[in-house]
Amino acid sequence: MEKYPSLNWVKETDFHKDTADLIRKGGDLVCFFVDDNILYRKIEVGEDTITKLFDNRDVFCLSLRLGANTIIQNEYTMQECVIPLRGEFVNETFLIWDWITQCEHCRSPLTGNYAYPFSVDGHVFKRDLVEKLIGNEDDFVKIKFETPNAFEGRIWDKGWDVSVMPKKMSSFKESLVVNSPLNLVGSSENMSGQKFGVSLEELNQKYLEGFDPDLDDMDFSNIQGCHQEIQLKFKEIANVRSV
């Protein structure tokens, strides 16, 4: 906590309730991340520019994990994404496309990442839209969840009235975030660690020995998917932590 004094740390007591409280007390924009997300490029525009994107366009989300470079749906099978056939390039900054035409059914995103607007992997939303999705307090209780993946899944399972939802997704020209699934935490059944896997125990030991991931030494030169294993590199830091 001392290392990042500008962050507002919240001790988890009840993941479901904590998430709801943070959403409702937050600013006009909401973004979710999980622990294996890496922001590997700087966001070069200000909050005002992003807010104008939402205010002036029928935009559901700004995806930090998508871009013209993210053409692979599954790096383990090398399945390719279904890329939108039409779209806009706005202010030489944002790609915009119709996510509904990418979907065979809005509750079952069969066509992949470009038809999947509600993600906890670095998607930015207007807060009032997220509040609409989770519903009132009674609705929110009904979609009980204990993890980020469960939160995402329950929102999709709840079903939406597409006619009242924003029809567009957006991203920057190239992705800024990649999910590097090097191991699994919790009950997720997603594949991970097939190329550069590192166990939780190994990571913890590195931390205790005074090492941090060195993003400057990691290779982000060929990001082709939202989920892509990146080999970890470490650097020794001055203020060594120990048990």
Please report, for each region that a protein language model flagged, where it lies by residue.
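Acidic donor-binding segment of Leloir-type glycosyltransferases
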Residues: 1-11
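Short beta-strand-to-loop acidic/aromatic patch adjacent to the donor-nucleotide binding site
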Residues: 28-38
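Short, flexible, basic/aromatic active-site loop/helix in glycosyltransferases
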Residues: 81-113
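Conserved nucleotide-sugar donor-binding
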Residues: 115-135
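C-terminal catalytic/acceptor-binding lobe
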Residues: 128, 132-243
